[in-house]
């Protein structure tokens, strides 16, 4: 790709900002639409809990294999082509998640689902970095907030359609139609370039400062994964809540995170990235400390709310930092930190379970709080 073509491809404005928001919404919508279908897949294929857990690992494997390659793909083909291709694959694959009826075919469908999600995740964040940089103001939190809103619409919408009596295939096809409409709406103003020319290898191992930012992303995604997988267990086993109510912990966390991100651009533009990164990571750590140190279910729920609100704008700031560093091309850096961060979601909950088995769940959560303090300690260096 010539420099001239490359420069012409990357001139984002208001319309590109709207298309970026649509891309984040589509990704959240597609990912969350699968969640209400999991029980149907389990019953259709005849899986027990253990075999279902192994099968679901295929999503993570697909994402981890695809994410490191996406930075180079966007450099060669542009954000637009990669986002549209991944979105199209997602639309084709979602109905297969309802139709596959053997473990082998379901594993393949889930691998493709994970790969498509991983590719669109990295590509839309590369586009977001370029668009934010061109705007001259903080926008990343708002983009990530639209992903959360898309998740709420995806999970809630499919659940509502199933509750109304539609079969799973009809419910997911309705979601796919909405995704196609939104992809077509976003199509024209997605970036045809990637901001970075690249004629090198398909994968570049992250180095130096990018590796450190990736570690901080790992910590933040680990904290998010711990809330997703362990907050309900914590509330039932250590705070005496009934299983039917224990989901409140993650629900409060997710709502606080969504609200924080939707208001995050205004907060970051007003306070600056350093104060938001420092305050957010400290808020998350304090939330966990409150949850584990006060023997009250209400205190734990308040603590989880603080974790969600505090963490809401940290990852967007880290993505901005990856886009602004000069150690690696921005597209490769974003692909690297996304991959490392995603490993936190996959490995973190298992590590928490291992620590909890050796000591207690409170100690395991305390370790997460300590890691969050390392993010706070890094705030000045990351945002300078």
Curated annotation (Swiss-Prot):
GO terms for cellular component: membrane. InterPro entries: MFS (IPR011701), MFS_dom (IPR020846), MFS_trans_sf (IPR036259), MFS_Transporter (IPR051788). CDD domains: MFS_MosC_like. Keywords: Membrane, Transmembrane, Transmembrane helix, Transport. It is a multi-pass membrane protein. The keyword RNA-binding does not apply. The chain crosses the membrane at residues 22-42, 52-72, 81-101, 106-126, 143-163, 164-184, 202-222, 240-260, 276-296, 299-319, 327-347, 352-372. Its main location: membrane. SUPFAM superfamilies: MFS general substrate transporter. Coiled coil: none annotated. It is found in: Membrane. Disulfide bonds: none annotated. It holds the Pfam family MFS_1. One of its GO terms (molecular function) is transmembrane transporter activity. Belongs to the major facilitator superfamily. This is Uncharacterized MFS-type transporter YPO1221/y2967/YP_0917. It comes from Yersinia pestis.
